[in-house]
Curated annotation (Swiss-Prot):
UniProt keyword annotation of Transmembrane present: yes
Species name: Salmonella enteritidis PT4 (strain P125109)
Gene: ubiB
Protein name per the record: Probable protein kinase UbiB
Alphabetized NCBIfam families for the sequence: PRK04750.1, UbiB
SUPFAM superfamilies reported for this sequence: Protein kinase-like (PK-like) (SSF56112)
Transmembrane segments: 501-521, 522-542
Length: 546
């Protein structure tokens, strides 16, 4: 470790101890050397004894800075790793930091635009940022070419070395978790950090975010439900993104929405429909739909439209995952726990040798109490969470795409019920899911699949006789090759057997000659001839092994 890394690690450990986070480590895991090390090098009392553990963890991460704040935000979505009181506190982490100097942002923009001054491309560039976060900040301007208002997102200068340095330390600490926590190995801390690293590095590439926004905008083009601002890709680079400036009401400002005359019931239901449309129709969903990234258009409050920004994190599901997920939801709400268990096994989410009866009983035990509530009060997100937590006891592998989906669903539910507390997600989603499943199976789906594949098979039809002939000929050659290899293996086996036999005889003659030479000198040349014969036989055997 470099001196800088040692200093940073020392600061991190002292921060954790000042918030009493060593409480997370069972006393029995702290050996005497570790205790001596802790009190000699890191003597630091808990200065926040009046606060609960979850709050202390949140405050410690906030003190450690942006990389740790985002790590805590990511951990808040992994409710399979933490008890609810800790996960809820981590969800409160705010990714708000002081803005960096606007002149540095201006210099980065000029560098991205080939060294030309900002005035060559933009009018009314505001040196004061509109918003600032740990990874990037946003400035406003107008395009010189058409006068349209835009926002310019710029990555913080020199943020990559800071991220890489802290990630190295997070990896080091993650490797200690299995040694210090009883359940540490099951938590797979290194995999969790690797998942976080991928998400964070992806956020540093604004070309990726630009592509995501363009895709989402195309998916919802002319939709009354969701609007994604236009991206001006000619101006975008890895460190800079330019997109249309939008004006809307923050979705969390319920009072302003009501004052504008917004149809709150329709708005809440559209949030659910937008989510399921992204997941099941498009297989491409905005995975960071927290209230700070969602606005509502001022126009047509009786027919409200969402506006989505910050498309840095997206998720996708393949066709099989979508089908299993939809069938899981329907089976769960029909209380068909056997079907839920079988779907988990069929999908490969749990090992194929899982005892389905035991799995069904575990799901029933955990999930049946949920139905004591009215359907309108049941949380889809918590349904998924309960299923994942139960499945993890049966060695369910972490499914990153499903973790993202569950996090997004919790956001959608939270926003929907904040807007309209009586929102019945099941009533809104069930027709969509049943319609989608019906569209994927049966005669219409088979007919559609055949139509899609027909041009391919028509194109390949003339080649089929030749392909069959080539396959038969290759099969014949393959059989010859197999026979040849089998003969060679048999010859080698015989040769190896002969070699071992000769090596054994040679070694026996050599040892016998040596014994007689020492103990029976009166035998004359006989021991010598035995030794020479042994060497010759041994060499012949050795050559057969070559």
């Amino acid at each position: 470790m470099t001196p800088g890394e040692v200093r940073r690690l020392y600061f991190i450990i002292r921060t954790f101890l000042s918030y009493g986070l060593d409480e997370l480590i069972p006393r029995m895991r702290l050996t005497l050397p570790l205790r001596l090390w802790r009190y000699s090098l890191f003597w630091m009392p808990n200065r926040h004894k009046d606060k609960l553990l979850g709050e202390r963890l949140r405050l410690a991460l906030q003190e450690l800075g942006p990389v740790w704040i985002k790590f805590g935000q990511m951990l808040s979505t992994r409710r399979d790793l933490f008890p609810p009181q800790i996960a809820d506190q981590l969800a409160l982490l705010q990714d708000k930091v002081a803005p960096f100097d606007g002149r540095l942002a201006k210099a980065q923009i000029e560098e991205a635009m080939g060294g030309l001054p900002v005035d060559a491309w933009f009018d009314d560039f505001d040196i004061q940022p509109l918003a600032s976060a740990s990874i990037a900040q946003v400035h406003t301007a107008r395009l010189k070419s058409n006068g349209k208002e835009v926002v310019i997102k710029v990555i913080r200068p020199d943020i990559l070395p800071v991220i890489q340095a802290d990630l190295k330390l997070i990896y080091r600490l993650a490797r200690w978790v299995p040694r210090l926590l009883p359940d540490g190995r099951r938590l797979r801390p290194t995999e969790v950090v690797r998942e976080y690293e991928k998400t964070l590095i992806d956020e540093l590439n604004l070309l990726r975010e630009s592509a995501n926004a363009i895709q989402l905008r195309r998916n919802f083009e002319n939709s009354p439900m969701l609007y994604i601002p236009e991206v001006y890709s000619d101006y975008c680079s890895q460190n800079m993104m330019v997109m249309e400036r939008i004006y809307g009401i923050p979705v969390s400002d319920v009072a302003a929405l009501e004052k504008n005359g917004t149809n709150m019931k329709l708005l809440a239901e559209r949030g659910v429909k937008v989510f399921f449309t992204q997941v099941f129709r498009d297989s491409f969903f905005h995975a960071d739909m927290h209230p700070g990234n969602i606005f509502v258009s001022h126009e047509h409050p009786e027919n409200p439209q969402y506006i989505g920004i910050d498309c840095g994190i997206v998720g996708s599901l393949n066709k099989e995952d979508k089908r299993y997920l939809a069938e899981n939801f329907i089976a769960f709400f029909n209380r068909d726990y056997r079907k839920v268990a079988e779907l988990h096994v069929d999908s490969g989410w749990v090992p194929p040798d899982t005892n389905v009866e035991d799995f069904e009983f575990a799901i029933r035990t955990v999930c049946e109490p949920i139905f004591e509530k009215p359907l309108a009060e049941i949380s889809f997100g918590h349904v998924l969470l309960n299923l994942f937590n139960t499945a993890r006891r049966f060695n369910m592998e972490v499914q990153p795409q499903l973790v993202l989906l569950q996090k997004t669903l919790l956001y959608v539910e939270g926003v929907g019920r904040q807007l309209y507390p009586q929102l019945d997600l099941w009533k809104t989603a069930k027709p969509f899911l049943e319609s989608w499943i019906k569209d994927q199976v049966g005669i219409p789906a088979l007919t559609r699949a055949l139509k899609e594949k027909a041009p391919f098979w028509v194109e390949k039809m003339p080649e089929i006789p030749e392909l069959v002939y080539d396959s038969l000929r290759q099969g014949k050659y393959l059989q010859h090759s197999v026979d040849k290899i089998a003969r060679e293996l048999q010859v080698n086996h015989v040769r190896q057997s002969q070699s071992r036999y000769l090596l054994g005889i040679g070694a026996t003659l050599l040892l016998s000659g040596s014994f007689l030479l020492v103990n029976r000198p009166e035998w004359g040349l006989m021991p010598g001839w035995l030794m020479v014969g042994g060497v010759v036989v041994w060499l012949v055997g050795w050559r057969k092994t070559r």
